[in-house]
Curated annotation (Swiss-Prot):
Molecular function, one GO term: ATP binding
EC number, as in UniProt: 3.6.4.6
Domain MIT positions: 7-72
Keywords: ATP-binding, Cell cycle, Cytoplasm, Endosome, Hydrolase, Membrane, Nucleotide-binding, Nucleus, Protein transport, Transport
Description of the deletion phenotype: Normal vacuolar development in early stages of trichome development shortly followed by fragmentation of the large central vacuole which finally disappears completely, associated with the formation of abnormally enlarged late endosomes. Abnormal sorting of vacuolar proteins that are instead secreted. Trichomes contain frequently multiple nuclei. Reduced ESCRT-III disassembly. Blocked vacuolar trafficking. Imbalanced Na(+)/K(+) ratio under salt stress.
Protein name (database record): Protein SUPPRESSOR OF K(+) TRANSPORT GROWTH DEFECT 1
Gene3D superfamilies: 1.10.8.60, P-loop containing nucleotide triphosphate hydrolases, Phosphotransferase system, lactose/cellobiose-type IIA subunit
PANTHER family: AAA DOMAIN-CONTAINING, PROTEIN SUPPRESSOR OF K(+) TRANSPORT GROWTH DEFECT 1
Lineage: Eukaryota, Viridiplantae, Streptophyta, Embryophyta, Tracheophyta
Domain of life: Eukaryota
CDD domains: MIT_VPS4 (cd02678), RecA-like_VPS4 (cd19521)
């Protein structure tokens, strides 16, 4: 029932703004006051804090405008026929728009609030991950380029029945680079990139979650060409009919199905990109909405070799090409995440050596580096002793060696099991394709 107060308030606002714009201030003032009374009554019953905040903001705006009009009327101005110049002078630079509560282009306060929350999902700064940083996955990269890069740079390619792909599902074991690939897409694509998770789209308020989904796709269409990346989509779109499925969850899935169907059949330049570790958990109707279902497997030896180089970056090391080949062969069964963790651990090995060292030598440039007792110029001292002498800034850890990697690999194990791989390979045979 309390929603009637809000609707009545909005109706009065529309009339008030209309009269205000026409300069009929003696008519606009009572209409503003009526709107304020209805908004005040609505606020007593409104439980949603976001909506309360939005209405309070508009209430303050209309109250300020009503006070300005009252001041004009007190001076004898009632509209264009009486002291119109004075009335114009008192107008605020931005008056309320003739719409539902004064939001953008007639948006009501609730929709404005939903969109404000989704704005944080837009990736404003490029993640700075290039295609070349993604090791392997050539088929997946080619398919994504066909869907993302070519339609923007070469729109003339897509004529007649040739249309770019509209929905991609990336699936595979954890840590294989699905989200990393999405970051590369965000970097390389000249498109608006929306990165969302279930927490961005699920609300505790009844009916708000599906509105968030609807607004997300609407914003993507307005910003086209655009990409919507949904990470861990299985948490949003599990199989329907399960015992633990709530009514809210069902409505989110239904809205997502409707929106994706719309994206697929209209040339709106909106690409949906989703990732999951559990493809079998997806609802079959959602699964069907994805044109391309690409398996992101564990990296091969060559890809792992490339990953070691990328993660080491410009950190000082003395590894040769045969050393990197050895590491690629040695890490069979490792995911991209496993390789990343391995390198992070290795990066600290020189620091550990420096902390434990009993001998240091002074290089020609004045820096001190740990060494063995037989190294030319070796001096028996410790890192703490050098720091006490004011040489802390001159201490440099040694470059990374193959031995450092062997030491770390001796204690690290892959995180993906054989049974995990079997599940994804079976799904690929039934529904997907190799990446």
């Amino acid at each position: 029932m309390y929603s009637n107060f809000k609707e009545q308030a909005i109706e009065y606002v529309k009339q008030a703004v209309h009269e205000d714009n026409a300069g009929n201030y003696n008519k606009a003032f009572p209409l503003y006051m009526n709107a304020l009374e209805y908004f005040k009554t609505h606020l007593k019953y409104e439980k949603n804090p976001k909506i309360r905040e939005a209405i309070t903001q508009k209430f303050t705006e209309y109250l300020r405008r009503a006070e300005e009009i009252r001041a004009v009327l007190d001076e004898g101005g009632s509209g264009p026929g009486s002291n119109g110049d004075a009335a114009v002078a008192t107008r605020p630079k931005t008056k309320p728009k003739d719409g539902e509560g004064g939001g953008k282009d007639g948006e009501d306060p609730e929709q404005s609030k939903l969109r404000a929350g989704l704005n944080s999902a837009i990736v404003r700064e490029k993640p700075n991950i290039k295609w070349s940083d993604v090791a392997g996955l050539e088929s997946a990269k080619q398919a994504l380029q066909e869907a993302v890069i070519l339609p923007v740079k070469f729109p003339q390619f897509f004529t007649g029945k040739r249309r770019p792909w509209r929905a991609f599902l990336l699936y595979g074991p954890p840590g294989t680079g699905k989200s990393y690939l999405a970051k590369a897409v965000a970097t390389e694509a000249d498109s608006t990139f929306f990165s969302v998770s279930s927490s961005d789209l699920v609300s505790k308020w009844m009916g708000e979650s599906e509105k968030l989904v609807s607004n997300l796709f609407e914003m993507a269409r307005e910003s086209a060409p655009s990409i919507i990346f949904v990470d861990e989509i299985d948490s949003l779109c599990g199989t329907r009919g399960e015992g633990n499925e709530s009514e809210a969850s069902r409505r989110i899935k239904t809205e997502l199905l409707v929106q994706m169907q719309g994206v697929g059949h209209n040339d709106e330049k909106v690409l949906v990109l989703a990732a999951t570790n559990t493809p079998y958990a997806l609802d079959q109707a959602i699964r069907r909405r994805f044109d391309k279902r690409i398996y992101i497997p564990l990296p091969e030896a060559k890809a792992r070799q490339h990953m070691f180089k990328v993660h080491l970056g410009d950190t000082p090391h003395n590894l040769t090409e045969p050393d990197f080949e050895y590491l690629g062969q040695k890490t069979e069964g490792f995911s991209g995440s496993d390789v990343s963790v391995c390198v992070k651990d290795v990066l600290f090995e020189p620091v550990r050596k420096t902390q434990d060292a009993m001998f240091f030598f002074k290089s020609p440039d004045g820096t001190w580096m740990p060494c063995g007792p037989r190294h030319p110029g070796a001096i028996q001292t410790t890192m703490q002793d050098l720091a006490t002498k004011g040489l802390a800034e001159k201490i440099i850890p040694p470059p990374i060696t193959r031995t450092d990697f062997e030491k770390v690999l001796a204690r690290q194990r892959p995180t993906v099991s054989k049974s995990d791989l079997d599940v994804h390979e079976r799904f690929t045979q039934e529904f997907g394709e190799e990446g």
